[in-house]
């Protein structure tokens, strides 16, 4: 896909997120909107995968640690062809395959059921370690939130991955600076995050999380690193594309009402598929 097509796709995904949350009447708005560009880059350029054969042995594995942002993953998967886009309207419904946190047993293409925050990187690191033992060539990716870095078990996984030089593992950090209790630096400061990962012997790449080309370039750089695992710190704006949601912790864990959804969709449609990044 061309850069313009990728930006248009990310905008379509953002619009679907708003519609899904409105229909569900519950869920998280800020994180999914902020990560639409990363998931577009993953599902349409970075991942080696086959939507028609989601259990293909050679596929790259994508773990979503902060499962509450799953609307963006579901929307990206639907647009990639894993299931009909119309099914997105079943988000959080009783019996739906699209639960409020992804469940592997329900939806093909999900590698693991998302559990407590902070546990996803441990799952991904274990999978990457097993892949190396089995001499498999696929890569393992893990999406984590910044607030998950307040969990001790996350750093145990960081240490484990470095000890075993898991160069087949790439983590993406959604560095959006908010969490349910407020701003991360007020709740429990995370900076200097880059230096912390470097101290654990990870390769660190920092990118504008709304520049799809930069995200793709960073993932390609990670593939070329063979000495240690890589983390890509994505500086994102929570609620990106919807002006009244951007950078506000109160939108971490609530959906829009009808009026807010209409305003949000108007904002997104005005963008015509173009989310401005710091590089422009």
Label each region the model flagged.
Residues 17-20, 32-163:
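Cofactor-binding active-site loop characterized by glycine-rich and histidine/acidic residues
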Residues 9-26, 174-176:
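N-terminal capping segment at the start of a domain
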Residues 1-5:
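Non-catalytic, mobile gating and regulatory segments of ester bond hydrolases
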């Amino acid at each position: 896909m061309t850069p313009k097509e990728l930006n248009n796709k990310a905008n379509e995904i953002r619009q679907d997120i708003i519609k899904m949350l409105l229909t569900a009447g519950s869920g998280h708005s800020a994180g999914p909107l902020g990560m639409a560009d990363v998931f577009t880059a993953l599902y349409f350029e970075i991942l080696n995968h086959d939507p028609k054969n989601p259990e293909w042995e050679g596929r790259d594995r994508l773990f979503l640690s902060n499962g509450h942002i799953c609307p963006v993953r579901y929307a990206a998967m639907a647009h990639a062809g894993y299931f009909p886009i119309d099914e997105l309207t079943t988000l959080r419904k009783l019996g739906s395959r699209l639960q409020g946190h992804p469940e592997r047993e329900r939806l093909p293409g999900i590698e693991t059921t998302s559990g407590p925050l902070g546990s996803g990187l441990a799952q991904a690191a274990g999978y990457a370690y097993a892949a190396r033992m089995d001499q498999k060539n696929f890569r393992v990716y893990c999406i984590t939130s910044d607030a998950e870095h307040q969990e001790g078990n996350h750093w145990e996984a960081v240490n484990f991955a470095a000890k075993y030089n898991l160069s087949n593992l790439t983590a993406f950090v959604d560095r959006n600076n908010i969490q349910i209790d407020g701003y991360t630096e007020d709740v429990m400061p995370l900076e200097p995050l880059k230096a912390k990962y470097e101290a654990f012997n990870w390769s660190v790449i920092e990118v504008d999380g709304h520049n799809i080309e930069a995200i793709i370039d960073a993932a390609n750089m990670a593939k070329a690193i063979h000495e240690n695992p890589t983390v890509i710190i994505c500086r994102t704006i929570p609620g990106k594309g919807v002006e009244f949601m951007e950078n506000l912790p109160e939108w971490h864990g609530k959906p829009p009402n009808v009026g807010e959804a209409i305003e949000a969709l108007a904002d997104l449609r005005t963008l015509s598929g173009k989310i401005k990044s710091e590089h422009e």
